[in-house]
Regions:
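Nucleotide-activated donor-binding/catalytic signature segment of Leloir-type glycosyltransferases, i.e.
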Residues: 239-260
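Aromatic "clamp/platform" in nucleotide-sugar-dependent glycosyltransferases that forms part
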Residues: 277
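Conserved acidic donor-binding segment of nucleotide-sugar-dependent glycosyltransferases
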Residues: 312-319, 327-331
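Acidic anion/phosphate-binding donor-loop and adjacent secondary structure
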Residues: 158-159, 173-189, 362
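Short hydrophobic beta-strand element within catalytic cores of glycosyltransferases
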Residues: 290, 294-297
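Membrane-proximal helix-turn-helix segments that form the acceptor-binding/catalytic region
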Residues: 79-82, 105, 129-146
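Conserved donor-binding/catalytic core segment of Leloir-type glycosyltransferases
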Residues: 4, 190-217, 227
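A short, active-site helix/loop in glycosyltransferases that binds the activated sugar's phosphate group
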Residues: 140-167, 174-176
Length: 362
């Protein structure tokens, strides 16, 4: 069976939740005998790979413009998928889903994964939000099967579009943690084990890293530092202002990191903090939980669905409450809580997606 995937910037080692999702999922599906091709956006990948972990990679030129690239790339990718003779086209995210009807007109079977209502993100203007809402509608109305990554999203599409049939709740997953130390990297950053708070995400407004910096700057940190791991796809006023504020307050910026550097930060941090106002089901949070570290997260529905203890949540946007949570963490002996990660297993998730493919291809 030939599966063609679009809606992601690319794999491997491309920043973003959808990208991490695809990087984990599709090699597992390919390993089970499926012919999988991921269509990548050329401006995000520089490795010149044609195949990775059994997944074929096709790169397409796409203008790197925030408002246009997803739609242009998806249009081109659908045409490539048709030429490749795809049995199933798997489209990720609501922006690319705008073109689900086009794929159906071409006679293709389509699976659509809804990763969250992106129109709620602060970075989009009115026109972009309107297009994203239309994309959500097209995906939910015309895709053969819809995968949702949280119960919040399942209820959303049920209430908005009355889409119940062939809707599948399949959570995001997380890989097994790779515990490690990296003394040379810690010396480079100027941090010590157990003496830093970690924020790990893209530098976009809805992640509210500016709230984390403000909250941290108000507390007696007792020598604990704040480390922000991540960056932005599009350098803009927000990301420039965020980095400037971070440097002003002595926050350590690592840039986009993966592999041993990231694993060492997760292994040894005091706590992970995610203050965001919008999420689908945050893979970064799941990854932090897999390392058995304390977490502090905003009380938005996507984070609440993870089902953590009440004391780790704070009201989104409440700087005072976040400062209090950070102070408590710093003044409490370091702990390593255990979380139930069973439903976030990528191997099980890949089998559930394969079942959808098999039924659709019959």
């Amino acid at each position: 069976m030939k599966i063609v995937v679009t809606g992601t910037r690319g794999i491997p080692n491309v920043m973003g939740g959808v990208e991490t999702h695809c990087e984990e999922l599709f090699p597992r599906i390919a390993a089970k005998g499926f012919n999988v091709t991921v269509i990548r956006r050329k401006s995000y990948v520089h490795d010149k790979l044609k195949e990775w972990k059994g997944v074929k990679l096709v790169d397409i030129e796409t203008p790197k413009k925030k408002a246009l690239e997803a739609i242009i790339h998806t249009f081109k990718a659908i045409n490539v998928a048709k030429k490749l003779g795809a049995d199933i086209l798997h489209i990720h995210a609501i922006g690319p889903a705008l073109l689900v009807p086009y794929a159906k007109i071409l006679g293709m079977k389509v699976v659509f994964t809804h990763h969250g209502p992106d129109y709620d993100r602060d970075k989009w203007g009115i026109m972009a939000k309107t297009i994203l809402k239309l994309g959500e509608r097209m995906g939910c109305m015309f895709a053969d099967d819809v995968i949702v990554i949280s119960d919040v999203i399942r209820n959303l599409i049920k209430n908005k579009y009355n889409r119940i049939n062939r809707v599948h709740l399949i959570y995001n997953g997380v890989s097994k943690p790779e515990f490690c130390d990296y003394p040379e990297y810690f010396n480079e950053l100027g941090i010590e084990k157990g003496k830093y708070i970690l924020g790990m995400c893209r530098f976009v407004p809805e992640k509210n890293l500016h709230h984390l910096i403000e909250a941290f700057s108000k507390i007696d940190n007792q020598g604990c530092k704040l480390v922000l791991a991540g960056d932005t796809d599009f350098e803009d006023d927000y990301s420039r202002r965020l980095k400037e504020t971070a440097r002003k307050h002595g926050v350590i910026l690592t840039g986009f990191i993966k592999g041993k550097k990231l694993h060492s930060l997760l292994t040894n941090c005091r706590c992970y903090c995610l203050p965001s106002s919008h999420e689908g089901l945050p893979i970064a949070l799941l990854e932090a939980m897999s390392y058995n570290i304390p977490v502090i997260v905003s009380d938005i529905p996507a984070n609440m669905e993870v089902g953590l203890s009440k004391d780790v949540y704070f009201h989104v946007g409440n700087i005072k409450e976040l400062s209090e949570k950070l102070t408590t963490i710093i003044n409490t002996p370091l702990t390593h809580p255990s979380y139930n990660m069973e439903k976030y297993d990528w191997d099980r998730i890949s089998n559930e997606v394969i079942d959808i493919y098999k039924k659709l291809s019959q």
